C-alpha cells in the first residue's frame, strides 16, 4: 500500500520520478496570472499567524467550510479570531478527502513550512499552529520571502484600467526584490455595458484618463491613455472574465455613439446593442494588444454571484460562483476572426470553466496560429473548478490530442494566496506522471533528453518566451 504524500507523490514509475525530481522541480515559477495584492508584495507583508495567511480571502477553502456546515462567522466573520477560523478549518480538512484541498493543504505545509509526515486535523492543529507561527515571525516567511523560497521568477497581477499601479512602480524601483511583478490589464468593467455600475465606472475612467467620455471615440482615447500607462509599468498581458460570450458585427461609430448615449442616459439596451458594443470594445482592445505585443487572456464560462443573499452580505469573489453552460464556439470563432482577418489577433490564451468546452478550445486554437510565434493561440491550463488532478489531466490530454502539448505555456496559480505556489508543484507532478506513463506504455519514446526538454519548456521556458515582448 502506498504511503500518503511522500517525495514521490503522484509519480507512479521511474521515468516520471526522474522527470520530476531532476528536471521539473528545479525550474523557476513563471506565474503569469494571479490575484495577489501588489501592495502586499511592495510592503513585504508579514503575516501574524497561519490562520491569516491560509484562510484570508481563500474562497476555495470557504466553500469547503460552508459545505461542512461551519457557521459563516468562522469563515468570513470579523467577530471571530484567526485562531477560531483556523480551528474550524482544522476540523474540516479531514472531511475533504477526495477534494484537491486535501492535497493542497498538505503540500502547503510541506513547502514552505517543512512539515512532513503529519496529517493535518484537529489533533495536530495546535502543534502545526505553533510551528508555522514561529516561522512566519521570521523574514524568510514574509510575502517576498515565501516567493523567493518557492523560486518565483515572475508574477502577473490582475489590475483594473483605472489603477494607479503605484505599487508596481514601487516594486520596480526596489533593488531588494529580484522577482518581476507585472500588472495585467483587466477591462471587464469597460466592455460589460449591461452592468449596473457601468456609468459610474465610466466616470472613474474619465478621471483616471483625464478624458470626457460621451462618444465611442472618447472611450478609445481614454483607454489608449490607460494602456500607455500600463505599458510604462511593464504590462504585457491582459485578462478578460467573460460570463456570456457575445458577438455581433461591429457597427460604425455613429451606431456605437448612439448605444453609448442610450446607456449614459439610463435607457435599456437591447441584447443586440449589448453584443455590438461588447464586440466593438473587445476587437478594438485586441488590436491594441497585438500592436503592443501583449498577450490576451479570455476566461470564459463562470456564472457569478449566484447567491443573492450572500452577495448582499459579503460582495463578489467570496465563494458563490459556479460553472456556466452557455454555448461559446460560434461567438468565440467570430470574435477571434474579427481580429485575425486584419492580421491583428494578439497572442491569446483561452480558458474554459466548463470542461465540456475543452475540445472546443483545443480545436479552436488551431484555426488561428501564426508564423514566427510557437503556440500563438493557447488552450490554457485547467481553470478554477478544473484546477485539480482530473481537470489538469483532461486539459493536458485533450491539448496533446488536438494541438501541440510541447508548446504549452503551462500552469498559473490564479490565486490570492502566497501559499498557492505549490499548485505549480502539483501540476508538474501530474505532467511528469502523464509523460512517464506514456513512455512506460510505449506510446512515446523513453528518451530522457527529449522528455526532459519538453518538461522544462512546459514548466517555465515556454511561458517566459511567450510573455516576452519582441
UniProtKB/Swiss-Prot annotation:
Membrane-spanning residues where?
Answer: none
Q: Which GO terms describe its molecular function?
A: glucuronate isomerase activity
Any one Pfam family here would be UxaC
Associated pathway: Carbohydrate metabolism; pentose and glucuronate interconversion
Where in this chain does the entry annotate a coiled-coil region? none
The record's catalysed reaction(s) read:
D-glucuronate = D-fructuronate; aldehydo-D-galacturonate = keto-D-tagaturonate
Q: What is its EC number?
A: 5.3.1.12
Family annotation (Gene3D superfamilies): Metal-dependent hydrolases (3.20.20.140), uronate isomerase, domain 2, chain A (1.10.2020.10)
GO biological process terms on file: D-galacturonate catabolic process; D-glucuronate catabolic process
Keywords assigned: Isomerase
Give the EC class as a word: isomerase
The Swiss-Prot or TrEMBL record describes its family as follows: Belongs to the metallo-dependent hydrolases superfamily. Uronate isomerase family.
> Which HAMAP family did the record assign?
UxaC
What is the name listed in the Swiss-Prot or TrEMBL entry for this protein? Uronate isomerase
Q: Which gene encodes it?
A: uxaC
Amino acid at each position: 500500500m502506498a504511503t500518503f504524500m511522500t517525495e514521490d507523490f503522484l509519480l507512479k514509475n521511474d521515468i516520471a520520478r526522474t522527470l520530476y525530481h531532476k528536471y521539473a522541480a528545479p525550474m523557476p515559477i513563471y506565474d503569469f496570472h494571479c490575484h495577489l495584492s501588489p501592495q502586499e508584495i511592495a510592503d513585504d507583508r508579514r503575516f501574524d499567524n497561519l490562520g491569516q495567511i491560509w484562510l484570508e480571502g481563500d474562497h476555495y477553502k470557504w466553500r469547503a467550510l460552508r459545505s461542512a456546515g461551519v457557521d459563516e462567522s468562522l469563515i468570513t466573520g470579523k467577530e471571530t479570531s484567526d485562531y477560531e477560523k483556523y480551528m474550524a478549518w482544522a476540523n474540516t480538512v479531514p472531511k475533504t478527502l477526495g477534494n484537491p484541498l486535501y492535497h493542497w493543504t498538505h503540500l502547503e505545509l510541506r513547502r514552505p513550512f517543512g512539515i512532513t509526515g503529519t496529517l493535518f486535523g484537529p489533533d495536530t492543529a495546535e502543534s502545526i499552529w505553533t510551528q508555522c507561527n514561529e516561522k512566519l515571525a521570521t523574514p524568510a516567511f514574509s510575502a517576498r520571502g515565501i516567493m523567493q523560497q518557492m523560486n518565483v521568477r515572475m508574477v502577473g497581477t490582475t489590475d483594473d484600467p483605472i489603477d494607479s499601479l503605484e505599487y508596481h512602480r514601487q516594486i520596480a524601483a526596489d533593488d531588494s526584490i529580484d522577482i518581476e511583478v507585472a500588472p495585467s490589464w483587466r477591462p471587464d468593467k469597460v466592455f460589460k455595458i449591461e452592468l449596473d455600475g457601468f456609468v459610474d465606472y465610466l466616470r472613474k475612467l474619465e478621471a483616471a484618463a483625464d478624458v470626457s467620455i460621451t462618444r465611442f471615440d472618447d472611450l478609445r482615447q481614454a483607454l489608449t491613455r490607460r494602456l500607455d500607462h500600463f505599458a510604462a509599468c511593464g504590462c504585457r498581458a491582459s485578462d478578460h472574465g467573460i460570463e456570456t460570450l457575445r458577438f455581433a458585427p461591429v457597427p460604425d461609430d455613429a451606431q456605437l455613439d448612439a448605444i453609448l448615449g442610450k446607456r449614459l442616459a439610463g435607457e435599456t439596451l437591447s441584447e443586440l446593442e449589448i453584443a455590438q458594443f461588447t464586440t466593438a470594445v473587445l476587437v478594438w482592445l485586441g488590436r491594441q494588444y497585438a500592436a503592443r505585443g501583449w498577450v490576451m487572456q479570455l476566461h470564459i464560462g463562470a456564472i457569478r454571484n449566484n447567491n443573492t443573499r450572500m452577495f448582499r452580505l459579503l460582495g463578489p469573489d467570496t465563494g458563490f460562483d459556479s460553472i456556466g453552460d452557455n454555448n461559446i464556439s460560434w461567438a468565440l470563432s467570430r470574435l477571434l476572426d474579427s481580429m485575425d482577418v486584419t492580421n491583428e489577433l494578439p497572442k491569446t490564451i483561452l480558458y474554459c470553466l466548463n470542461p465540456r468546452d475543452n475540445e472546443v478550445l483545443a480545436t479552436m486554437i488551431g484555426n488561428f496560429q501564426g508564423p514566427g510565434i510557437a503556440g500563438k493561440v493557447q488552450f490554457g491550463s485547467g481553470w478554477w473548478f478544473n484546477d485539480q488532478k482530473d481537470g489538469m489531466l483532461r486539459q493536458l490530454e485533450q491539448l496533446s490530442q488536438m494541438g501541440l502539448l510541447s508548446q504549452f505555456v503551462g500552469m498559473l496559480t490564479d490565486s490570492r494566496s502566497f501559499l498557492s505556489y505549490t499548485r505549480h508543484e502539483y501540476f508538474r507532478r501530474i505532467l511528469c506522471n502523464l509523460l512517464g506513463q506514456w513512455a512506460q506504455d510505449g506510446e512515446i519514446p523513453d528518451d530522457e533528453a527529449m522528455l526532459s526538454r519538453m518538461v522544462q519548456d512546459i514548466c517555465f521556458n515556454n511561458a517566459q518566451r511567450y510573455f516576452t515582448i519582441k
